Amino acid sequence: MKRTYQPNKRKRSKVHGFRARMSTKNGRKVLARRRRKGRKVLSA
């Protein structure tokens, strides 16, 4: 059985990246939440 995590920089950015987050209303909510919490890294 293959492992579920097959690293791929492009997919990681497309799915979890900053611009992906900014492109939707809920994604912006995620960033706002993480800023409020004081996360050093906001997105992938």
Swiss-Prot record:
Region described as Disordered: spans on this chain: 1-44
Tree of life domain: Bacteria
Organism: Geobacillus thermodenitrificans (strain NG80-2)
Record keyword Ribosomal protein present: yes
Keywords from the named record: Ribonucleoprotein, Ribosomal protein
GO process terms (BP): translation
HAMAP family named among the record's database cross-references: Ribosomal_bL34 (MF_00391)
GO cellular component, as recorded: ribonucleoprotein complex; ribosome
Biased amino acid composition, Basic residues: 1-19, 26-44
Pfam families reported in the protein's UniProt record: Ribosomal_L34
NCBIfam families in alphabetical order: rpmH_bact
Coiled-coil intervals, chain numbering: none
Record-linked PANTHER family: LARGE RIBOSOMAL SUBUNIT PROTEIN BL34M, MITOCHONDRIAL RIBOSOMAL PROTEIN 34 FAMILY MEMBER
Protein name in the entry: Large ribosomal subunit protein bL34
InterPro entries: Ribosomal_bL34, Ribosomal_bL34_CS
Family: Belongs to the bacterial ribosomal protein bL34 family.
Keyword Ribonucleoprotein listed: yes
Recorded GO MF terms: structural constituent of ribosome
